[in-house]
């Protein structure tokens, strides 16, 4: 019972606590951790705009007093872009949309926390901080500026504006001119004001437009964790406006003037000269002396002439430096531009005369002369009467002479003068004085003092006019001319124009043409134009003469000439028909061997003279063929005997008349026909003997047979005469023709008998015909002479005379090749047996045998000489 009582208070308190809890359930709340916190309710959260999408940016954090679990939520105002998302369980917030501070610098978001019963919501603002993600941008482009050229240096001419949407250093802009070297402009780095550089001016006459490239650069800043600088560029076009801004310009500076002791007051000492720098619309020039004159000089305001207004004795200084001002006067009379120079005036009492040139009539600074071209080198131009004089004395009167102009043509003598001299101009280069190159020469003769500080000088203009002479030979345009003309060209046809030129003028440049040479007969030439044409009677024929060669002469009026060679080729045309040879009327054709006909075309060139052959008519037509190119006529290949011919034709005697055509290849083509009588025979008919073969071969040409026969007879007569002459000899004393005597010299009787051994014999050839052959002993001894008809010794018993020596041996011929001539001139070899009788031994062998017999008889008898 006690135990039950103890449980009652516990149950009571539990029920009370539950009831109390139901009645007092508290809502959850966010932790407020302050600025910079990464968890809490996102109050005062700042987020850089370069935060990448998907990045974790915050953690919502809170608690429930009752200890219940909480969840988190995140919403946006209706119509707003959702930038964040939250995990309801852990409160992690993620960026889901790219931030851009320049478009939205703060984001309103509603965060909530709930314990399942109670939900607490808070509206917070998330600040978007800047990142340097924008480039500078120029405003109001393009930039075109017009600036007067007289704008002072350093002046502001334009302001360039650029903006950068970034904040802080990323939004600050610095301006820079690119390519500063050589630029006439500068820019304020912070304001963007464009100015003309100090010390630099614009000039419309030099440059009308300038292009300036300007760079705008921000101050840099962080972007995604890295320092980033952005730039932009633009071009400023500056047009320079022309104004009257160019000052006058002096010419001929420096200026020097002299006042001599004899100078009179009011004399002009020197003249200064200036012109307006603005050439387009120049203003009037006004001269004035600013200072330095000390009242001794004045200047002509319009001409610039400076005049001395005191006498030389009143001048207190030796040198006056006159500061001369020149001004431009506007049409309104205002002085708008100025320029300054210094004119030096020296007061001297010596050397007050410059060199002066004189002609025949006094002082003169221009001389002229007319002369022929190409004078000899070293010749003096006597037509120029020039004297030079310096009235000063001593060293002040010494000066040099010099020719100024084309160099190396003339030279002046003397080159150094004291007081006065006669000026001589001499030819130095005759070839350079050429009328065809220059009609006149212009020189300046300069005289300049040597040892004076003033270096006074004077000039004289020398003009030399040239006259032409005939110094040029006519020249042909070519050394040779090649022409071609058809052979049928009528008389008077143009062949070629041989033109020449003569550089001389007038009559000396006129040319007359002529031709000469062995080949010029058919041609004429126009004496003025050089056109070569054929004689009216000329009939050119390439078959007679196809090439002509002659000379053309170009001659001027004084006989100077040049030559050119002319080559004329006469072009062949087809004007001849082929002509058959005379021996084609009758032909003998051996079976297996062709006969040839031949025609000649007298045209000079191919293809006009190429002949083609053809058979126009033959009955029957199946017997003969002809070679188109050679003209050889032969039987058809299947005809090999007379029997075949007689079987296929009606003509049993094998004789035909064939009409043959010869046609050339010219255009137009010409042709000729001829009738050839052909007698067909076989080769076996020629074996009946040499004479029969020869007569058969010569059947077509009987004159050939007669000629051969006459030749053989003439050869036999010549041989007979030669042999007869050799056997007889003329005795000079008796003037009779007698047989040749042979003299034999013997040894004395005391010698042993001689034998007929031929080694002791020696033939000796003599120039004397009476001693044609002699045999003498080798040993010396008393001569045994034969005195011919005057010898009175014992005569030898008579004996028969020696027969004449036989003819020379002919070679033994067993077989000789005989040839059968054909129409074409070719030879057909034929083998003919011919037996030749052997000849007797030669004459020399017979003579030796006879001499040996005589020697043997004399050895037995006496020591006399035998005839």
UniProtKB/Swiss-Prot annotation:
Name of the featured protein: Cadherin-related family member 1
Question: A GO CC term?
Answer: plasma membrane
Q: Which Pfam families match?
A: Cadherin (PF00028)
User: From which source organism is this entry?
Assistant: Xenopus laevis
Extracellular domain ranges by topology: 22-707
What UniProt keywords are attached to this protein's entry? Calcium, Cell adhesion, Membrane, Receptor, Repeat, Signal, Transmembrane, Transmembrane helix
SUPFAM superfamilies (alphabetical): Cadherin-like
Tell me the ranges covered by the Cadherin domain, including all copies: 39-138, 139-250, 251-357, 363-476, 477-580, 572-692
Cytoplasmic side stretches? 729-867
What subcellular compartments does it reside in?
Answer: Membrane
Q: How does it sit in the membrane?
A: Single-pass membrane protein
Chain segments annotated as transmembrane: 708-728
Tissue-level expression reads: Expressed in photoreceptor cells of the outer nuclear layer of the retina and in the pinal gland.
């Amino acid at each position: 019972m006690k135990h039950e009582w103890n449980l009652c208070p516990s149950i009571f308190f539990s029920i009370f606590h539950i009831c109390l809890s139901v009645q007092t359930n508290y809502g959850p709340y966010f932790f407020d951790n302050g600025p910079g916190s990464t968890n809490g309710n996102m109050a005062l959260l700042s987020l850089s705009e370069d935060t990448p999408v998907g990045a974790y940016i915050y953690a919502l954090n809170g608690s429930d007093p009752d200890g219940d679990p909480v969840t988190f939520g995140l919403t946006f105002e209706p119509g707003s872009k959702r930038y964040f998302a939250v995990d309801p369980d852990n409160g992690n917030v993620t960026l889901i949309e790219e931030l851009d501070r320049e478009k939205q610098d703060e984001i309103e978001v509603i965060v909530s926390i709930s314990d399942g019963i109670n939900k607490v919501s808070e509206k917070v603002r998330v600040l978007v901080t800047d990142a340097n993600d924008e480039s500078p941008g120029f405003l109001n482009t393009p930039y075109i500026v017009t600036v007067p050229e007289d704008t002072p240096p350093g002046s502001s001419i334009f302001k360039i504006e650029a903006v950068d949407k970034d904040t802080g250093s990323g939004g600050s802009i610095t301006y820079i001119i690119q390519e500063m070297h050589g630029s006439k402009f500068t820019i304020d780095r912070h304001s963007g004001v464009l100015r003309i550089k100090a010390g630099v001016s614009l000039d419309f006459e030099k440059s009308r437009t300038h292009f300036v490239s300007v760079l705008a650069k921000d101050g840099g800043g962080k972007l995604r964790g890295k320092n980033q600088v952005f730039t932009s560029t633009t071009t400023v076009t500056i047009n320079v406006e022309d104004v009257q801004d160019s000052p006058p310009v002096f010419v001929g500076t420096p200026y020097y003037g002299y006042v001599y002791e004899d100078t009179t007051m009011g004399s002009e000492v020197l003249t200064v000269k200036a012109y307006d720098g603005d050439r387009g619309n120049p203003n009037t020039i006004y001269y004035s002396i600013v200072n330095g004159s000390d009242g001794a000089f004045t200047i002509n305001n319009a001409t610039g002439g400076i005049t001395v207004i005191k006498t030389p004795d009143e001048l207190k200084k030796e040198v006056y430096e006159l500061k001369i001002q020149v001004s431009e006067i506007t049409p309104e009379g205002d002085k708008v531009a100025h320029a300054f120079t210094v004119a030096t005036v020296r007061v001297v009492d010596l050397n007050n005369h410059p060199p002066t040139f004189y002609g025949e009539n006094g002082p003169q600074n221009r001389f002229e002369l007319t002369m022929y071209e190409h004078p000899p080198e070293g010749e003096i131009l006597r037509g120029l009467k020039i004297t030079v004089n310096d009235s000063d004395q001593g060293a002040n009167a010494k000066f040099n002479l010099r020719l100024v102009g084309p160099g190396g043509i003339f030279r002046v003598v003397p080159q150094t003068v004291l007081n006065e001299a006669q000026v001589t101009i001499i030819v130095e280069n005759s070839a350079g004085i050429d009328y065809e190159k220059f009609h006149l020469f212009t020189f300046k003769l300069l005289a300049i003092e040597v040892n004076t500080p003033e270096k006074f000088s004077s000039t004289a203009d020398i003009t030399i006019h040239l006259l032409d002479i005939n110094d040029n030979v006519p020249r042909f345009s070519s050394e040779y001319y090649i022409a071609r003309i058809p052979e049928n060209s009528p008389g008077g046809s143009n062949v070629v124009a041989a033109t020449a030129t003569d550089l001389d003028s007038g009559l000396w440049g006129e040319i007359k043409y002529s031709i000469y040479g062995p080949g010029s007969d058919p041609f004429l030439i126009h004496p003025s134009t050089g056109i070569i044409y054929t004689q009216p009677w000329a009939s050119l024929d390439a078959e007679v003469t196809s090439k002509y060669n002659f000379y053309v002469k170009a001659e001027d009026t004084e006989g100077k000439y040049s030559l050119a060679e002319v080559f004329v080729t006469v072009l062949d045309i087809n004007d001849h028909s082929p002509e058959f040879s005379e021996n084609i009327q009758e032909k003998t054709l051996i079976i297996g061997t062709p006969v040839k006909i031949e025609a000649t075309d007298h045209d000079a060139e191919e293809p006009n003279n190429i002949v083609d052959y053809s058979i126009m008519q033959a009955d029957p037509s199946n017997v003969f063929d002809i070679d188109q190119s050679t003209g050889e006529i032969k039987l058809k290949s299947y005809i090999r005997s007379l029997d075949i011919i007689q079987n296929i034709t009606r003509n049993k005697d094998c004789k035909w008349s064939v009409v043959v055509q010869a046609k050339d290849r010219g255009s137009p083509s010409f042709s000729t026909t001829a009738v050839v009588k052909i007698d067909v025979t076989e080769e076996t008919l020629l074996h009946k003997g040499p004479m029969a073969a020869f007569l058969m071969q010569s059947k077509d040409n009987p004159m050939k047979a007669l000629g051969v026969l006459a030749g053989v007879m003439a050869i036999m007569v010549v041989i007979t005469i030669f042999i007869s002459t050799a056997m007889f000899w003329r005795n000079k004393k008796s003037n009779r023709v007698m047989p040749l005597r042979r003299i034999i010299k013997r040894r004395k009787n005391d010698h042993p008998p001689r034998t007929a051994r031929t080694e002791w014999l020696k033939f000796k050839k003599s120039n004397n015909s009476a001693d044609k052959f002699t045999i003498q002993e080798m040993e010396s001894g008393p001569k045994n002479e034969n005195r011919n008809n005057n010898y009175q010794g014992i005569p030898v018993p008579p004996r028969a005379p020696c027969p004449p020596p036989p003819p020379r041996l002919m070679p033994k011929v067993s077989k000789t090749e005989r040839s059968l001539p054909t129409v074409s001139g070719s030879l057909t070899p034929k083998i003919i047996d011919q037996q030749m009788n052997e000849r007797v031994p030669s004459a020399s062998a017979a003579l030796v045998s006879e001499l040996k017999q005589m020697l043997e008889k004399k050895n037995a008898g006496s020591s006399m000489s035998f005839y």
